[in-house]
């Protein structure tokens, strides 16, 4: 006898669903086993799982830090950091403390004053900004006038031997102490023949320039008590000192402390010299540079130590390795997406003047050409990543102060 249609349907349906239920159960069991196997394999092969599931690694606890002051020291990879901060300001609609009027820095080499910031004196004495990162000579009470109380302060240091070599080539014709000497080795062999202490500020790039940028006396004798007291000052004022030689590890640490996303801290190397404008110092010259810049040498040694101690406190070695690997991988992806030939170009090869960095002295400062044919959104992302310091500052200035005359960067066209 044939069962009524409805019963048969229900019966058939029931057995169908029972079979399907079994299949679904199997599916989840297999998936669970697979996941366990991957985790086991990752453990055995010392692979960080976040490398396999990148979206997991981009999770951060709590809101991002948005009040940030970066002391932009000279010739220390600071333009690359500035690019990161300007991008963050622009994409998060944050205000930046930019140089007033037609200026390109915040009063450097004079000690910073709040009135060097555009708009600091408008809207009453309480006007505060989110991001501050243009060159200035650090002067905490004045910086505090334009930055909120909960600002995160950080800076970056570089081995003074290489920092001095970079300065020498870049500021060769600008700094009196460097003007009349053929090489840095010759300068370091008898610095007092070229360095006139009474010229003060104009020679700041020639000796202990990071110490000077921090607001201290770059000609002070490196006496133990004095050095220790100033290092303590820096520790009190800054939450973090990064190290240019370990730039990627620095970005991992910075991102963690600021609770930013990975893409916020991925950057291309900016303001780098082409290989033919880098000179090498003899081993004796290197030792003399450490002696000549003894204050910077102490500064660098001290904060190189604290940097690694901080990294160890924040991340296990394996986690650090995997985060650095992820950062590099993402940089490679973005280079392939944005850059012509995925690499930097020297000044004569850069076709768009808006992307050509400011050139100084004998240095050939490299930049980038973008790939042709990028869609609008990708183009915007890529342009931001390769935009040199002066152009980016002028761009933000126009966005922030549309009624003011724009910064005149026509000289970059030459
Ligand atoms: N990501 C990264 N890692 C390591 N080093 C880097 C990085 N980005 C820039 N650089 C090097 O930093 C030098 C430029 O420093 P600044 O941008 O601070 O110079 S400036 O004071 O703003 O003119 C310049 O050094 P030299 O090439 O020796 O002159 C750059 O090569």
Label every model-predicted segment.
Residues 2-414:
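Membrane-interface amphipathic segments in extracytoplasmic regions
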């Amino acid at each position: 006898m044939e069962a009524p249609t409805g019963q048969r349907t229900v019966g058939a349906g029931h057995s169908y669903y029972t079979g399907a239920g079994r299949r679904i159960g199997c599916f989840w069991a297999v998936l669970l086993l697979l996941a366990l196997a991957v985790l086991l394999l990752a453990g055995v092969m010392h692979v960080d799982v976040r490398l396999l599931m990148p979206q997991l690694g981009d999770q951060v606890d709590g809101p991002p830090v948005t009040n940030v002051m970066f002391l932009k020291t000279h010739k220390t990879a600071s333009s690359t950091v500035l690019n990161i901060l300007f991008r963050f300001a622009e994409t998060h609609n944050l205000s930046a403390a930019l140089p007033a009027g037609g200026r390109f820095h915040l009063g450097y080499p004079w000690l910073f004053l709040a009135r060097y910031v555009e708009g600091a004196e408008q809207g009453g004495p309480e006007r505060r900004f989110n991001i501050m990162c243009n060159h200035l000579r650090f002067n905490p009470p004045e910086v505090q006038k334009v930055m909120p109380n909960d600002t995160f302060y950080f800076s970056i240091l570089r081995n003074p031997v290489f920092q001095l070599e970079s300065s020498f080539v870049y500021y060769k014709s600008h700094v009196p102490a460097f003007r009349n000497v053929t090489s840095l080795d010759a300068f370091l062999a008898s610095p007092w023949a070229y360095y006139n202490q009474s010229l003060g500020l104009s020679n700041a790039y020639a000796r202990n320039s990071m110490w000077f940028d921090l607001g201290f006396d770059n000609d002070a004798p490196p006496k133990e008590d004095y050095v220790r007291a100033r290092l303590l000052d820096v520790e009190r004022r800054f939450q973090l000192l990064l190290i240019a030689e370990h730039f990627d590890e620095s970005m991992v640490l910075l991102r963690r402390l600021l609770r930013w996303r990975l893409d916020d801290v991925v950057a291309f190397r900016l303001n780098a010299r082409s290989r033919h404008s880098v000179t090498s110092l003899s081993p004796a010259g290197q030792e003399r540079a450490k002696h000549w810049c003894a204050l910077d040498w102490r500064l660098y040694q001290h904060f190189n130590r604290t940097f690694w101690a901080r990294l160890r406190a924040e991340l296990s070695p394996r986690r650090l390795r995997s985060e650095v690997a992820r950062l590099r991988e993402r940089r490679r992806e973005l280079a392939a997406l944005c850059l012509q030939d995925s690499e930097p170009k020297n000044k004569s090869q850069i076709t768009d003047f808006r992307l050509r960095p400011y050139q100084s002295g004998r240095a050939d400062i490299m930049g980038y050409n973008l790939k042709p044919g990028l869609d609008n959104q990708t183009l915007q992302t890529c342009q931001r990543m390769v935009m040199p310091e002066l152009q980016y500052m002028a761009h933000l200035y126009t966005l922030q102060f549309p009624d003011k005359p724009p910064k005149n960067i026509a000289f970059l066209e030459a």
